[in-house]
Structures are given as C-alpha cells and as structure tokens.
Amino acid sequence: TCIKQKKDRWAVRIKEMAEEMPDCGESEIGWRVVRKLSVEAAKQLEPIFEEHKGRNGRLSIQTDPRLIRSTQALVDQAVEFSELAPNIIVKAPATKAGIAAIEEATYRGVSVNVTVSFSVAQAITTGEAIERGLKRREAEGKDVSTMGPVVTLMAGRLDDWLKIVADRDQLFIDPGHL
C-alpha cells in the first residue's frame, strides 16, 4: 500500500537498489525495501512511543514466512528488525520453531507480536515462552520495562476461511457461530 501511494518515489528507489545490487534477487530487494519503509514509518510513530513510555507507538514488521521452520533464522531476523528503530515490534509465528525463537528473541530484548496463532493452546504456549524469555532477562538484570510483547489470536482469519468454505460447499452455519 505504501509503495502504491508513493509510487513515483519508490519505483525509482527500487530500480536503483536493483542496479546497485545486481547479485540480489527480487526477494532480497523486497526485504531491503521493507526495512527502509519500516524505519520511515517507525520514525513517524516515535512521538507516540516516547509519550507512552514504549507501551504504544510501535510498528510491526513480519518475519520472512519462508523461515517458519528455522528457530535460529527467525531469531536472527527478529533481532535485526528490532535494531532498526526503538519502537519496532516483530511478528513471529506460533509454530514449533517460532515458539522457541519467540523465547530467545524476547530474551534478547525483542518485543514480539506472535502471529499464526489459532488456538488457545498456542496462545498459552507462546505466552509461556515470552514469560521465560522475560524472566531470563530479568535474572541477568536486563531491562524489560519498555518491552511490549503481544499474542494475537487469529480467530478472525479462521472465521473468514470457514465462511468461504460454507459458501463454496453451500453449508448453512448459524451466523452467531461465526
């Protein structure tokens, strides 16, 4: 959306980046654009972040979905993204590798937003991983006061899919149940 809204600016910059990095593919160039856009957007939110002492004014950046099975790759990217600006919160998936990454990233000072969480069990498990990461930080005397971890239970996404399936298969589901 941001690139479409400022197409004149970003089309030129993306072309320049592609020329500057001839060995990089579209994906790497795309992630570099994400980083640049994120830094700019985070800067716009900094006054809110400062006013609310780190509790509001955060910008979410999604980790690369292709890393979903690699704990270390998710941790590395989460740490990298968190260092782009003080008010970054990093989205990480509630997968087996993601949950381990969430604990480690939290320990390293990354504020996380857990995504791909569709069940209460996932929410509890990721909440426990966040707590372990925070406790490890505190045990070493590291600050946790401005960290703002979030677990997003994505029930709405599941409801959207169930509505599509119900329409496709001509199933009647009481609207009160979706």
List where the protein language model places each region.
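Structural preference for beta-strand elements that scaffold enzyme active sites
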Residues: 56-60, 87-91, 109-113, 146-152
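Charge-rich, low-complexity amphipathic helices
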Residues: 63, 67, 103, 127-128, ...
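Basic (Lys/Arg-enriched) interaction patch that binds polyanionic ligands
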Residues: 92-122
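Catalytic alpha/beta core domains of metabolic enzymes, predominantly
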Residues: 111-178
